[in-house]
A protein has these predicted regions:
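Repeat-associated, polar segments at repeat-unit boundaries in modular proteins
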Residues: 182-198
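Low-complexity, Pro/Thr/Ser/Gly/Ala-rich linker/spacer regions in secreted
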Residues: 1-4, 147-159, 198
């Protein structure tokens, strides 16, 4: 049975696992350890979160199959584009044979043998948010919405819409930029703003 996870929960877990001691290991999904290090490959990061690893995981649970990075972007994502200015919080970012999670604020969490050899934060080249965290930069080819993630958390978006009405995000282009930088889809938020103002 397909069980969606809220985008904020998904991103929070990805950022939390980046803080734990990890090593990159092909074919693992946070289901094994090497000493204190949790082992994980790139698609295993996404699957591991969705399957409940490393703590109470169950292989292929929650309607999420065991697929690789290329299958994940081609068969398990919607709205796939090569335009990185369209990045939204919780989207998968992909290049041939590799995948990561865009967490908003110019941060991707990915598991890679490159740079830090494990789960790490990087910057997606072409992102509309500046690399203010001075992260290693990777050029991704595509991004898309994972079908296992609930990107429409109405209560969260309703609060954001209320904050927009109060002026927290500015007006005009500044509002669009600020919402995008915060990882929200401007059009979705604006629809809720319009409905609240009726």
């Amino acid at each position: 049975m397909l069980k969606l996870i809220k985008v904020n929960d998904f991103v929070t877990k990805a950022l939390a696992y980046e803080q734990r001691p990890t090593l990159y290991k092909l074919g693992t999904y946070m289901n094994r350890k090497n000493g204190k290090y949790i082992l994980c490959d790139c698609s295993g990061l996404i699957k591991g979160i969705l399957w409940g690893y490393p703590d109470k995981g169950r292989y292929c649970s929650n309607g999420v199959p065991d697929v690789n990075a290329n299958t994940m972007i081609s068969k398990c994502c919607t709205g796939v584009t090569s335009d990185m200015s369209k990045l939204r919080k919780g989207m998968a970012v992909w290049l041939n044979g590799h995948i990561g999670i865009y967490c908003g604020d110019g941060v991707v969490v990915e598991s890679s043998p490159r740079w830090e050899n494990g789960i790490q934060r990087t910057y997606p080249k072409g992102c509309p948010v500046a690399n203010k965290h001075k992260l290693n930069t990777r050029k991704w080819s595509k991004c898309g919405y994972l079908k296992w993630i609930d990107y429409t958390s109405t209560s969260d978006l309703t609060q954001v819409a209320k904050d927009v009405i109060k002026g927290k995000y500015g007006n005009g282009k500044k509002r669009i930029d600020n919402l995008t930088k915060a990882g929200y889809n401007y059009e979705e938020v604006q629809k809720i703003v319009n409905s609240l103002l009726k």
